[in-house]
Amino acid sequence: MLAGLSPHLSNLRRSLTQVLNFALVLSTAFMMWKGLSIYTNSSSPIVVVLSGSMEPAFQRGDLLFLWNRSPRAEVGEIVVYNVRGKDIPIVHRVVRAFGDDEKSPKETNGQKKKKVMSSGKKDSIAAGALHSDSALVSHRILTKGDNNIADDTELYAQGQDYLDRKLDLVGSVRGYIPAVGYVTIMLSEHPWLKTVLLGIMGAMVILQRE
């Protein structure tokens, strides 16, 4: 009886080993991803270019590596940001930056210098007004695709004229590998490929068992 169960136990052991190996691969990949996210301070340290708006600098399918520990994003720098309310990363270049050490362009153009009044209550009011005028704004940027005519104002959330460095940016591009991420685009645009891929993986598992 035990001899008859031996082949079944062997097959079960082999199946469990394959499941554990697969789980180990997934957990290792997840840990590496989370570790890279912590190191780069980016929720998505690796992204794929989905459109041709940054041609010729980047093509569709290019794999980008991001870094998000710099306090500022300078003009000319290529960044990745998420539009508020949407989960689609956009890769564009910074064409204007301000904040932290200067005032918002709209605020600067719309404000007038206030005269200091000479006595009592008027002095305190004027001092408060001057303090308000000199208040710094958070670092904000305006972006644009190299292959686009207009800037990204129309892409931002409703009522948003600029991106906030801390709230909107996923990271700045520090490196890339051409065309490697095109598989991701193909799977996204052609869902049936996922079924084919899963079928191939299943066939490979069955063949390995035999």
From Swiss-Prot:
InterPro entries: LexA/Signal_pep-like_sf, Pept_S26A_signal_pept_1_Ser-AS, Peptidase_S26, Peptidase_S26B
Stretches in topological domain Lumenal: 39-210
GO BP annotations, alphabetical order: protein targeting to ER; signal peptide processing
Reaction it catalyzes: Cleavage of hydrophobic, N-terminal signal or leader sequences from secreted and periplasmic proteins
UniProt GO molecular function: serine-type endopeptidase activity
Cellular compartments per GO CC: signal peptidase complex
C-terminal short (CTS) helix: region residues: 196-207
Cellular compartment(s): Endoplasmic reticulum membrane
Residues forming the catalytic site: 53, 92, 152
Glycan attachment sites: 41
Keyword Hydrolase appears in the UniProt entry: yes
E.C. numbers: 3.4.21.89
UniProt keyword terms in alphabetical order: Endoplasmic reticulum, Glycoprotein, Hydrolase, Membrane, Protease, Signal-anchor, Transmembrane, Transmembrane helix
Ranges annotated as spanning the membrane: 22-38
Cytoplasmic-side segments: 1-21
Membrane topology: Single-pass type II membrane protein
Quaternary assembly: Component of the signal peptidase complex (SPC) composed of a catalytic subunit SEC11 and three accessory subunits SPC1, SPC2 and SPC3. The complex induces a local thinning of the ER membrane which is used to measure the length of the signal peptide (SP) h-region of protein substrates. This ensures the selectivity of the complex towards h-regions shorter than 18-20 amino acids. SPC associates with the translocon complex.
Domain notes: The C-terminal short (CTS) helix is essential for catalytic activity. It may be accommodated as a transmembrane helix in the thinned membrane environment of the complex, similarly to the signal peptide in the complex substrates.
Function as written in the Swiss-Prot or TrEMBL entry: Catalytic component of the signal peptidase complex (SPC) which catalyzes the cleavage of N-terminal signal sequences from nascent proteins as they are translocated into the lumen of the endoplasmic reticulum. Specifically cleaves N-terminal signal peptides that contain a hydrophobic alpha-helix (h-region) shorter than 18-20 amino acids.
Annotated family: Belongs to the peptidase S26B family.
Protein name: Signal peptidase complex catalytic subunit SEC11
Species classification: Eukaryota, Fungi, Dikarya, Ascomycota, Pezizomycotina
